[in-house]
Amino acid sequence: MNNQSNHFTNPLLQLIKNVAETKNLAIDDVVLCLKTALAQTYKKHLNYVNVEVNIDFNKGLMQIEQLFDVVDDNNEDYDDFLEMPLSEAKKLNPNLEVGGVLRKPVSLKDIKGDLISKMVLLFNQKINETAFKTVMSDFINEVGQVIEARVEDIDTNKDGGLKGYIVNLETTKGYMPKRELSKGEKLDIGKKYLFVIKEIQKQSSMWPITLSRSDSRLLEFLLNSNTPEIANGTIEIKKMERSPGTKSKVAVISKDPVVDPIAAILGPKGERIRGISEEFNGEIIDIVIWNEDKLKFLVNAVLPAEVVGYNILQDDERDTSIEIVVPANQIANVFGFKGINIRLISNLTGWSSVDVYTEKDAAEQGIEFTRVNFQPQGIFGIKKRRDKISNNPRNNNQQLASDKVFYTSKANVVDDEIIVDLAKQAEAKRVKQIKQEATKPELQLQQELNLEATPKVAAPTPTPAPQPTPAPTKVEPVPPPVSVTPKPIPKVNKPKPVVKPKSVFSITVEADDSKTKPEKSSAKTNTPQTKQTFDNFDDL
């Protein structure tokens, strides 16, 4: 038999190696794809119906043969694509007999022109199919799992706009489309991020693994990782809804009555929930107490706004709809920025429609509603913290004790320590003001008598002039006016020391229209501002 072998060229050898490394495939798999592509190209485009391709990668040899069945010369009906008369076959191999198989060598030179492009296209198709099978076997059971991976490249369109990100998964590549990003989020090449393996596409010419950072399972993973009480099963996440990058609502329940689920998820000074929020570009995360009763669950989900009343629509078409009545100054908070908050509430609680009215609007439209006669869940620590402030003699602003300040289950409100810190800062500012005011009478008196300022020491027989209000305690002693015997002390109208400080809490309290609004304070704290939660739609 006259065999002809084609030696590999160095570029072809290198091509096989590169494809194997890039697609994370074995050399034998790549060789098999090449053999299949060559054989199909010969059969389809050169009418070489029965072709066999043999490749020895280690020796760098390739053998392509066309196979013919040997038939008797008297057979006039033979198929010249598959069969060859004995006389013709013996010219190529004298040892053949009828019924044998002739192997006729084929040269690679027969593949030329546009056939090369078609063969390469077919080869790439076979490579992708093989790579997909490998990926499927490795990742099919990982769908829904969270992985940490590095962003390798950015995929852009013709105009340079973002299409998505190419992510290195070590054994293969993953792809995250732009739609799977959180709102306003941008990823950096070379940096590691957390991703959810969202799906594996069966038909993909590039990256079959689709990744996501907007999937709710990523939020669930972070809550579980950062909250030991969730990890050990004490707190259970019942349901969650997300508007990625803007706001989320998470319904939870505690299996231990001693464990407050909201406080546990917030963590000390809100550190736990703050870290999770930063992972999603500052996304607001509301923690809601789950309740099997849909009405009570809805009232919990509306917090920190108050549901005054409700009307469940019983007609057949909207049997799961409800109308709720809230105070006029809270209706904007219930809707939220672009209606995001009310959509999350509706989806979370399972009501097909939640219509919101003020009492005035409900009356004008003739809506009869039932008053809410139960206490919503999710106001953790309110009584304890309110009493701390209202019973503290240092704080004269009674508006601090209103429910409006702490009536919330929002994740950006922290625990008692923040309230104590605010009180300390208020006291420090007040002491500073009193010190400044207390020195004014002495300086004015010295100017009247043309006396030099004297050190602050106690006089033997102090006779201070009567004050409108007593000086506060724990303040450095202020010397009384100097007594002069030769002539009477001129009467000086002393300014009243300021006793009532400007409340640092005025930034978080919305005063009623009938009351005087407290003055704004310049005090700065690290505590998230409740007013922003209520009034700033961009933060909802």
UniProtKB/Swiss-Prot annotation:
Domain KH: 319-386
Keyword Cytoplasm: yes
One Pfam family this sequence matches: NusA_N
Composition bias, Pro residues: 461-489
Keywords: Cytoplasm, RNA-binding, Transcription, Transcription antitermination, Transcription regulation, Transcription termination
GO cellular component labels: cytosol
This protein's record includes keyword Iron: no
Sequence segments annotated as region (Disordered): 457-540
GO terms for MF: DNA-binding transcription factor activity; RNA binding
One GO-annotated biological process of the protein: DNA-templated transcription termination
PANTHER family linked: TRANSCRIPTION TERMINATION FACTOR NUSA (PTHR22648), TRANSCRIPTION TERMINATION_ANTITERMINATION PROTEIN NUSA (PTHR22648:SF0)
Subunit structure: Monomer. Binds directly to the core enzyme of the DNA-dependent RNA polymerase and to nascent RNA.
Name the record gives this protein: Transcription termination/antitermination protein NusA
